[in-house]
Amino acid sequence: DHPVTFRERLQMSIYKIPLPLNILEAAKERITWTLNTLPRVCVSFSGGKDSGLMLHLTAELARQMGKKICVLFIDWEAQFSCTINYVQSLRELYTDVIEEFYWIALPLTTQNSLSQYQPEWQCWEPDVEWVRQPPQDAITDPDFFCFYQPGMTFEQFVREFAEWFSQKRPAAMMIGIRADESYNRFVAIASLNKQRFADDKPWTTAAPGGH
């Protein structure tokens, strides 16, 4: 045996290996393993099609298994009303299995590709007129999370949230992405360079905190 070279690792990450399961069967198998293995599970839900399907599958399986889940939804303020209505409808549909629904309406910064004059967008920015008001039960208090810093980026927030949610114990943040949408998304799952939660679970990614 010889050590796997970088080129070999890259090639192994490029090619898909068909499984004997279809996508739905594989997703249910992975979600079931997660619910059975980890004591705390949170679905990252954007209101879009991929994360919406992930929430449906996870909540339905949790209901069948008598488990509870949490949901993270980051409200970007300038969102379509139909998206907000959809988020609210799923929240109500699975209220029996959702232990905590973290509806985030805090100032967060992200890239803005819609303006040449404002390359970054900060939702819920203090002292400006908002596009719409957040729900009454949304998290708007900057002191709710010990890690929160005003205007922190979306990427920083989700990393810190995952660490906070884990409570320094094994936990899962569930995301729904389709590898066919882009090569970057495929590599995010298939890469051999990432740290996995378990060696035989290549679809997992381990965070430094162990979740």
Where are these regions (language model features)?
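ATP-dependent adenylation/nucleotidyltransferase module used to activate substrates
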Residues: H2-H211
